[in-house]
Amino acid sequence: MKMVFGALFLLSGMILSAQTEKKPEMLTKETFREKVWDYEKNPREFIYKGDKPCLIDFYADWCGPCRKIAPYMEEFMTTYAGEIYVYKINTDQQKELAQMFQARSIPMVLLVPMKGQPQKTVGAYPKEQYQQMIETTLLGRPAVAQ
């Protein structure tokens, strides 16, 4: 009987932890237009639709450097919870978005501040460098000497 209760307790804990694990939201053309920029309505001007700055990771499943930075993006969901949105765009599945932002080399990270134009970085950087970009570009905080 103790074994049954122990197993049920363990199973419920695993289910609960899986439900609270946060991953960046995957964007499609449609959700990108809803949450980031409706480029069909405003094709000449980037008008950000979000209520917080965002970071968008353009990636592909087969890309080694993309897999390397994926845990950073997941960590930023927690570190900057309530301050920024973290999104992902699969360049193999969302070719129109990849072409629009000229994501020819990946990983490519697009930093979208509340005001101004998005800034992009290409390549895999150390986590601390992404944190510095988030702090200065997205949150407007002073650069921290490392």
Feature map (PLM): residue ranges:
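Non-catalytic, surface beta->alpha helical segment in thiol-disulfide oxidoreductase systems
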Residues: 105, 110-146
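A short beta-strand-turn-helix
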Residues: 28-53
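Structural micro-motif
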Residues: 53, 95, 101-110
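N-terminal targeting signals for export/organelle localization
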Residues: 1-33, 141-146
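Short pre-active-site segment immediately N-terminal to redox-active cysteine/selenocysteine motifs
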Residues: 51-54, 58-62, 105
